[in-house]
Amino acid sequence: MKYTSYFLAFQLCVILGSSGSYCQAPFFKEIQNLKEYFNASNPDVAGGGPLFLEILENWKDESDKKIIQSQIVSFYFKLFENLKGNQIIQRSMDIIKQDMFQKFLNGSSEKLDDFKKLIQIPVDDLQIQRKAISELIRVMKDLSPRSNLRKRRRSQNLFRGQRASK
């Protein structure tokens, strides 16, 4: 488990490396602390290939990539929550979580609260399963890009009709 966690911390560094994160000494230092703690220099860490990097490379469209990134960020939040209380790496995890919060959720505490709420929903609870199935139709409608397109067309037609009548 230690090697896997270290490898994940290393991948986090790579994922968040865009936008000059590598140049920021405090963030880079905290990633280095996690690397040392999880012994990332061991060759068996790379066994089986990367966890997230190949998946991220497969998704080119920015909006699609956000979906994958949300799952990856969710994973790291769960990982950090699992390691919570480990005083040796707690400061490093807090700094990295704060940076993720700024980058992924644009610093919005409401979005962070909703994100945390979603990742903490237990999937093995029967009542939760029943609620999720009950809401599935509305969720699917919300996911459908066609419904947004119809709304847009409808409002465009209304606007055009108002202009034509004048």
UniProtKB/Swiss-Prot annotation:
Glycosylation sites: N39, N106
An example Gene Ontology biological process: positive regulation of smooth muscle cell apoptotic process
Subcellular location: Secreted
Residues making up the signal peptide according to the UniProt record: 1-23
Keyword Transferase appears in the UniProt entry: no
Single GO molecular function: type II interferon receptor binding
One GO term describing the cellular component: extracellular space
Tissue expression pattern: Released primarily from activated T lymphocytes.
Chain positions with Pyrrolidone carboxylic acid modification: Q24
Keyword line: Antiviral defense, Cytokine, Glycoprotein, Growth regulation, Pyrrolidone carboxylic acid, Secreted, Signal
Key word Transferase present: no
Family, per entry: Belongs to the type II (or gamma) interferon family.
Assembly mode: Homodimer. Interacts with IFNGR1 (via extracellular domain); this interaction promotes IFNGR1 dimerization.
Function: Type II interferon produced by immune cells such as T-cells and NK cells that plays crucial roles in antimicrobial, antiviral, and antitumor responses by activating effector immune cells and enhancing antigen presentation. Primarily signals through the JAK-STAT pathway after interaction with its receptor IFNGR1 to affect gene regulation. Upon IFNG binding, IFNGR1 intracellular domain opens out to allow association of downstream signaling components JAK2, JAK1 and STAT1, leading to STAT1 activation, nuclear translocation and transcription of IFNG-regulated genes.
Protein name as catalogued: Interferon gamma
Species per Swiss-Prot/TrEMBL record: Tursiops truncatus
